[in-house]
Amino acid sequence: MIIRFKINEIECEVNEEKEDITILQACTANGIEIPRFCYHEKLTIAGNCRMCLVYVTNEEKLLAACGIPLDENFDDESIETEIDEILKAREGVMEFLLINHPLDCPICDQGGECDLQEQTLAYGLDTGRFYIKKRAVEIKTFGRLIKGIMTRCIHCTRCVRFLTEIAGVNELGVLGRGYNMEIGTYKKNVMIESELSGNIIDLCPVGALTSAVYAYKGRPWELKNIKGIDIFDTLLTPINYQVKGGEIFRILPRINDRINEEWITDKVRFHYESYKIIEKIRKETPSYKIQANKFIELTWKTALKMVFKVLLNKKNKVDLIIGSKINSTNLRIYKELMNRLGSKNYITENGLMFKKFNYDLRENYINSNDLYNVDKNDLVLLCGINLRVESPLLNIKLRNVNFGDDEIESVKKIGIIGNKFDWKHESEYIGATLNSMLKLFEGRLPYCQQIKKSKAPLIIVGPSLLTRISLTLQEMRAIFMKACNLKPENILIITQGANFGMALEEGLFKEKFSIGGNVLYSIDSNEVQVTNKINYVIYQGIINDKFENKIDLYLPSKHYFEDFEGDREVYMNTFGQRSEIEKLSISKGNKIKENSMIGYIQLMYLNNKEMTRKEKEQKDIKLSYREMKKEEKRKIKVNKYLTINNIIENYYMTDINIRLSKNLMITGQLRKEKKIMEAGIWKNRKCI
Amino acid sequence: MFRSLLKRTTFLNQLNKSNGFNRNYFKQSTLTRSDALSRHVETEDNNEHTPFDFTQENLVKVEKILAKYPKQYRQSALIPLLDLAQRQNGGWISLRAMDKVAHICGIAPMTAYEVASFYTMFNRTKIGENFVQVCTTTPCMLRGSGEIIKTCKSHLGIQVGETTPDNKFTLVEVECLGACVNAPMMCINDDFYEDLTSASTINLLDQIKNNKPTKIGPQTHRKAAEGPQGKTTLLEPPVGPTCRDDL
Ligand code: SF4
Ligand code: FES
Ligand code: FES
């Protein structure tokens, strides 16, 4: 049935069968703004703030627009949002909200982006009438990252809904009632144990939940937005750096419905602390080690000469390892450099995990799935991946998978091979060893039948499985497709590192690579094991904490977001989606050079010619799987009883930037020890 | 100069007082009610390590309660189970007891905390053996509940919200308990005592203190809620059904 109605004299119609929308959504679609506090697009409807009241003809009372679906009752009715009655009602609601709200806007971090402030200005009464006692609630601690000044809370319950529905942790709740109602953890000093807890800071419409790291640092109107990406995750979530005067003040998500919706992980939200520390402790000039712990400073000219002395020495065997944040321009330059030197020993640090890889076809390293409709799947099998830690954003997408009505029955729609971890739905735990994986390949498990039966299964293969089995990705895919009757879209392969896909795009991979040479040239790569065989280490990057004392020649280079020629650079995620990043400069030292600049100089030195930039043709190549099937016949040789453990032990330790962010580190440690936070942690933070 | 400043502040104070408000006065949530604080208070007898488990006979009751609800909605048993736990625990419900109930219902502990803190009849801090709840809502107040509360305070030697040192009594004020016809009234544990006077209150408290039997219901000669002329309506016996038999 088509419903025709009017909103403020605008004629609208809604097809009831096709669209299922509320009054508020219809108003927004027609460009009419309705003030709100508790309603949020991505959360369930609570309807407890009453700010969204509208007038509907033939209704006795005003209706809360956020919670009322448009159905046949609205046919021929008209909805009014600007009449006096509504304005009066809004004033009333605002007045009630402000009774107990403290007047500390000048010292509140939300000031300037506070919904309550803005809406008071737009819809509130111009004078207050309450001179009675104000209620106060004690300050609560939710960990090192989130500051909870709960007197400011207006009880919209967005934070509670986010944590229970989306993040899947039940650590916040609505306690007490009436005058005594509080949002809190009930027990004292409970840390919110979610990788996505930082999002409640963005969700909170007032300053009750604010970032502890950003506390008293800046005001939103002085900050400039610069586009960036979440470099710690293969999804490459779009983010915004908020900067002022060459310093990152905070990081906020950029909305993208295909990737992150509105959320970002805590890791990227709070890691910017480290840049400041890095700025303080890094070396700003090229330097050379003469003794243990004793460096002399060099000029760039001599430093580069020394590099060439090493690289061009015929006796040396050079391995080039590139870090996971380097962009594709640099990947191309350094590959070219190594090629000119006649060597093929180059790889990215994440590529090191894989023994074999066929990067001829794009299908082999890029997933053809679309995250947008990931929740349409009706069965999920996780192989060797702890989604919560390895890809928290994908995890929350999958947590909302609609399992239909049989969710209640005992059919378990989630299978896990590898380490156990908590999920919303009950899951079937298949096994931790490779043996169960092999059984699955051969179709011997009862679970295979379930996979075959389901309409849209999704199999997620994690890096820990890929590294323990001597199969290439495409072989794995082919086996799966054969064993369980699947299509390529049903398999999702999660790798690690931001530039893994891009490196393969540039052909920067070598099969069976092992660090065997005596010279290691590391470009911003920390996660490499430096053996005793290596007698010369060139480290070109920012800061190193893994093999710092083994570095012989240090070349300071810039961060990944400072290091490209134009204003923008494009990164590609594991789904082949591209995210743009903009240039941001925070490095102060003028002797710090871009990786690309160093690379070009080296190339020019090599043959005094401009490098011709070869771009690999970026067409979508669709090829049949015939070739792969040939390879499939090879036997799989593995130790059957190897367990598929997680690659990432501690979520808060995976990258140098994270290891250097104090608050993230402490959060990680606290969580590791499962320790309840000590009281008084705020006192040493000089926050309040 | 200091003196003039002092004068000025006292003047301001007086002004505030005479206007009947004080602008800068912030207040913590009230402590005196049975709903107490909206959070857990760590004490010796109620902390993370205080053990709680249902007794054998109560476990049978738990099964019975769970059987009333469809299997997939077993969280509906939350309130009856919390009540059972509270009874077993001596009138109050500890942190671990809530965790236990939540576990039985298959929900997060937080949900149990939310429910227990919402309903004022769940006590989340330790109370005395006898929980004296004096009604102070309008009908009772008009019939003299102020006097009753005063008597309780002076006789037990405690304030509202406190427990006697011998752990016998806890005194609280409550809202209407639905016995307004026989106001003023109070409720001690599960029993109602109505038509109170100061004397009968003292008498009652003494009897309870010495573990003597008490008269439940009106403390005067009134029978149930009859008026002064006795029963005038509903003279014939009630027709059934009277109550659900599964309750
Ligand atoms: S803390 Fe913020 S998000 Fe949570 S209920 Fe209060 S106002 Fe809403
Ligand atoms: S937005 Fe509708 S009630 Fe809060
Ligand atoms: S007012 Fe006291 S019982 Fe109703």
Swiss-Prot record, chain A:
Enzyme Commission designation: 7.1.1.2
Stretches assigned to the 2Fe-2S ferredoxin-type domain: 1-85
Gene3D superfamilies: 3.10.20.740, 3.30.70.20
Cofactor(s) listed in the protein's UniProt record: [2Fe-2S] cluster; [4Fe-4S] cluster
Catalysed reactions, as listed in the record: a ubiquinone + NADH + 5 H(+)(in) = a ubiquinol + NAD(+) + 4 H(+)(out)
Chief localisation class: mitochondrion
Disulfide bonds, paired cysteine numbers: none
UniProt-annotated binding residues for [4Fe-4S] cluster 1: H101, C105, C108, C114
CDD domains with a match to the protein in the record: fer2 (cd00207), MopB_Res-Cmplx1_Nad11-M (cd02774)
Cofactor details (free text): Binds 1 [2Fe-2S] cluster per subunit.
Pfam (any one): Molybdopterin
Entry keyword set: 2Fe-2S, 4Fe-4S, Electron transport, Iron, Iron-sulfur, Membrane, Metal-binding, Mitochondrion, Mitochondrion inner membrane, NAD, Oxidoreductase, Respiratory chain, Translocase, Transport, Ubiquinone
Function (record text): Core subunit of the mitochondrial membrane respiratory chain NADH dehydrogenase (Complex I) that is believed to belong to the minimal assembly required for catalysis. Complex I functions in the transfer of electrons from NADH to the respiratory chain. The immediate electron acceptor for the enzyme is believed to be ubiquinone. This is the largest subunit of complex I and it is a component of the iron-sulfur (IP) fragment of the enzyme. It may form part of the active site crevice where NADH is oxidized.
Annotated family: Belongs to the complex I 75 kDa subunit family.
Descriptive protein name: NADH-ubiquinone oxidoreductase 75 kDa subunit
Gene that encodes the chain: nad11
UniProtKB/Swiss-Prot annotation, chain B:
Keyword Transport: yes
Presence of the UniProt keyword Transferase in the record: no
EC number: 7.1.1.2
Disulfide partners: none
NCBIfam families linked to this entry: nuoE_fam, PRK07539.1-5
Amino acids binding [2Fe-2S] cluster: C135, C140, C176, C180
Catalytic class of the enzyme: translocase
Assembly with partners or alone: Complex I is composed of 45 different subunits. This is a component of the flavoprotein-sulfur (FP) fragment of the enzyme.
UniProt entry keywords in alphabetical sequence: 2Fe-2S, Electron transport, Iron, Iron-sulfur, Membrane, Metal-binding, Mitochondrion, Mitochondrion inner membrane, NAD, Oxidoreductase, Respiratory chain, Transit peptide, Translocase, Transport, Ubiquinone
Cofactor note: Binds 1 [2Fe-2S] cluster.
Origin superkingdom: Eukaryota
Record CDD domains: TRX_Fd_NuoE
Protein name: NADH dehydrogenase [ubiquinone] flavoprotein 2, mitochondrial
Transit peptide location: 1-40
Similarity field: Belongs to the complex I 24 kDa subunit family.
A biological process term (GO) from this entry: mitochondrial electron transport, NADH to ubiquinone
TM segment ranges: none
InterPro entries the record matches: NuoE-like (IPR002023), NuoE_dom (IPR042128), NuoE_N (IPR041921), Thioredoxin-like_sf (IPR036249)
Cofactor: [2Fe-2S] cluster
